[in-house]
Regions:
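An amphipathic, basic-hydrophobic helix/alpha-beta surface used to engage anionic
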Residues: 1-134, 175-180, 185
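Short, well-ordered alpha-helical microsegments
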Residues: 185-188, 278
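Von Willebrand factor type A / integrin I
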Residues: 1-33, 168-174, 193-292
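Short, well-ordered secondary-structure micro-motifs
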Residues: 131-132, 188-190, 216-219
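Short secondary-structure boundary/capping elements
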Residues: 65, 155-159, 249
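Short, catalytically relevant binding-site loops at active-site mouths
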Residues: 182-186, 211-214
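Von Willebrand factor
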Residues: 139-174, 214
Length: 292
């Protein structure tokens, strides 16, 4: 899987990433979207809350149910899709960089084809590049070119906190995808849990890209395998006869990563080069948020 403009354009996928799941509502046809407000397209009904103007009451629904309901609308501009793209050295291992690039281009293509804005932030130990969210084909090509030209950079430790600060500072609201292997300490201080009042303006999803060998080794493996740490520059020997212990440890690492993401209000999915990433991401996005 190559990371060239030609290959990325030929294999870009349209992803169904903009409707998450049905709302538990007494009215048929309601869908849960990332953001709601007083725009122009009718979205859903909800019970009257403190501070809601009486002019927004839907009297037909109120008469039908005996409860006061107000109409909500999709914002005039739906929302921005942001891609936080890890370019730390560990992403250069195996085919991870190419897989991550294909996923990023597909997300950008899907966002812009759906008339949403899309932006891109590269990060490693710090923010390495920023393309503000905009719409249009020329903007998609700008994102594509940036991804093609991006190369893993050496750093002692990947830091995600700085890129999250950049996101929140620069973008008022977004549906954000973090593309990374997450093989580093997750120094989150932000929480993206959706509040009952809908005050959170960023819905964040994590797409963990790993090589198969970072998940498990084949049973009954034998021999010694030199492993090079792309970030520290150190090499260690792995005794393949300890495959069962290795598999157990790697599962513990992934479970810890998922737990920390969950605590920050970020749902996650793991993708390898062997996966159909479009199918897996579409399925992932149709799940109700489990960590909120």
């Amino acid at each position: 899987m190559a990371k060239t403009e030609k290959s990325l354009l030929s294999k870009r996928e349209l992803l169904d990433i903009f409707i998450n799941h049905r709302v538990h509502s007494p009215f048929p046809g309601d869908w849960e979207s990332t953001f709601k407000g007083l725009g122009y397209e009718f979205w859903s009904l909800r019970e009257l809350g403190p501070g809601d103007p009486f002019s927004h009451i839907d009297w037909k629904a109120t008469a039908k149910t005996g409860k006061y309901y107000v109409r909500e609308y999709l914002a005039e501009s739906y929302f921005n899709v942001m891609i936080l793209y890890d370019i730390s050295a560990s992403v250069g291992f195996g085919r991870k960089e190419a897989v991550q690039a294909h996923i990023a281009v597909s997300i950008a293509h899907s966002a812009i084809m759906s008339n949403n804005g899309c932006g891109l932030i590269f990060f490693a130990d710090d923010v390495k590049g920023y393309i503000p969210p905009r719409m249009g084909r020329s903007h998609f090509m700008e994102i594509l070119t940036a991804i093609v030209n991006a190369a893993p950079v050496s750093c002692r430790e990947t830091k995600i906190q700085k890129v999250m600060t950049k996101l929140i500072t620069e973008v008022p609201e977004s549906l954000t995808f973090i593309l990374s292997d997450f093989m580093y300490p997750l120094d989150f201080t932000y929480s993206f849990h959706t509040t009952v009042h809908g005050t959170n303006k960023h819905e964040v999803k994590a797409v963990q890209v790993l090589e198969e060998g970072e998940i498990s080794l084949p049973p009954h493996s034998r021999g010694l395998l030199p492993l090079y740490d792309y970030e520290s520059g150190e090499t260690v020997l792995l005794d393949l006869s300890q495959w069962s212990l290795y598999n157990q440890k790697m599962k513990e690492v992934r479970d810890t990563i998922k737990h920390r993401l969950d605590r920050a209000g970020i749902d996650s999915v793991t993708i390898t080069p062997a996966d159909d990433f479009a199918q897996k991401i579409n399925t992932f996005m149709k799940r109700p948020p489990s960590s909120y």
